[in-house]
Amino acid sequence: MEELQGYLEKDRSRQQHFLYPLLFQEYIYALAHNHGVNGSIFYEPVEVFGYDNKSSLVLVKRLITRIYQQNYLISLVNDSNQNRFVEYNHNNFFXSHFHSQMISESFAIIVEIPFSLRLVSYFEEKEIPKYHNLRSIHSIFPFLEDKLSHLNYVSDILIPHPIHMEILVQILQCWIQDVPFLHLLRFFLHEYHNLNSLLITQKKSIYVFSKENKRVFRFLYNFYVFEWEFLFVFIRKQSSYLRLTSSGTFLERTHFYEKIEHLKIEHFVVVCRNFFQRTLWFCKDPFMHYVRYQGKAILASKGTHLLMKKWKYLFFNFWQYYFHVWSQPYRIHINQLSNYSFYFLGYLSSLLLHFSAVRNQMLKNSFLIDTITKKFDTIVPVIFLIGSLAKAKFCTVSGHPISKPIWTDLSDSDILDRFGRICRNLSHYHSGSSKKQSLYRIKYILRLSCARTLARKHKSTVRTFLRRSGSGLLEEFFTEEEQVLSLIFPKTTPFILHGSHRERIWYLDIIRINDLVNHS
């Protein structure tokens, strides 16, 4: 009867941390811009615009005091907009921008502490050495190669966003029971929600969701996704259990949801009583796999199309009743794997079917056996990559290379280094593609864009510049994969490099997707 209660409180009981006093500790802000925090488990370094990247305890204390003043943040924007050409008011407008960064950065740093400690302790308990190796994005693809070839249907899920910031705070409240800290966070989100509304009417940028402030909001969003995945795992386990229980046992289990008390998710229990009991046993599927990436998710199953539709509407009800998030049916697409290609982490993935006939000879009789083998295939989406290059001003939308005027002030070595780094990163990331020849076009665009940029800097034509500099200037853009592999594998290693342009090599040191392959 207490299975759900124990499952939901299993991890939350550890989160009895008091975070509010940490806002007034000097060492927190010394760690904030330390190299150790820059290499944090969760995030990349955040660059604060117009600031020397040194947080101050005194400034934070003053900001916390002032933020409780009525309409303090909005008044700064109003004062600055009355006369933009007055230096004092311009400083006030910049101060509102800077204050939002300071407060959000402080929240993000402190709220990460208990969860990073919990993650480290988890791997220590499981005795998993070097858990940072598990962060590789490419580790997902070998998993898909092993699992998807045996499945039939896949659902592309676009995870909905919460319509109100209070939902995020309430979810966090179930895990961190620190009233002052949550109250300040709620007040901060409320004030900047009003500030955003004011800035939208004035056709200005939204500071809260800007690049400088994305750290704390990315944490809250990821935590919201983690919460519904946490409950989804429970639903999945119950659906797997139901296929092994008798009908009498199932009728007894339908009442244990109503008997649970003293939980922080009473609303979830009410939802279960309303629709969960009627739909759960329809969704039993022993072969189901779930992968989430960049605000999207993939749910693959060996079941029928009807079963996938039942899971689809269960998600809709779950989001609506528990998270108060309204989701449209177009957010989930159900497709058959054998006839569908889906874009996944910079690759165009599909399930290829290979038909073959085997002649079997038995005594005087012979007969043919038709066999079908499935293979998970990943190719480079050249059209999407060209679109990303066009957006970054390396080429036109049709793929015609152009110069990069903003880089002409750099030295020749810096220009070559930047273009070469982009080219190597793309080749490194797409090393698992089954058709790497398509990368040659991307390399050609970058090579010619680099030549045009250097020629523009020296006020010359591309042909004249290359004739004067030598043909070997841009050879690094066409570094063969064999040369890269020869640096990784020792000569004594029996590794066949011949034909490696057809080999699929997944590098397990890539922890985040490259900006140029992020098309979402």
Swiss-Prot record:
Keywords: Chloroplast, mRNA processing, Plastid, RNA-binding, tRNA processing. The gene is matK. Usually encoded in the trnK tRNA gene intron. Probably assists in splicing its own and other chloroplast group II introns. It is found in: Plastid, Chloroplast. GO terms for biological process: mRNA processing; RNA splicing; tRNA processing. It holds the Pfam family Intron_maturas2. One of its GO terms (cellular component) is chloroplast. The keyword tRNA processing applies. Belongs to the intron maturase 2 family. MatK subfamily. One of its GO terms (molecular function) is RNA binding. This is Maturase K. InterPro entries: Domain_X (IPR024937), Maturase_MatK (IPR002866), Maturase_MatK_N (IPR024942). Its main location: plastid.
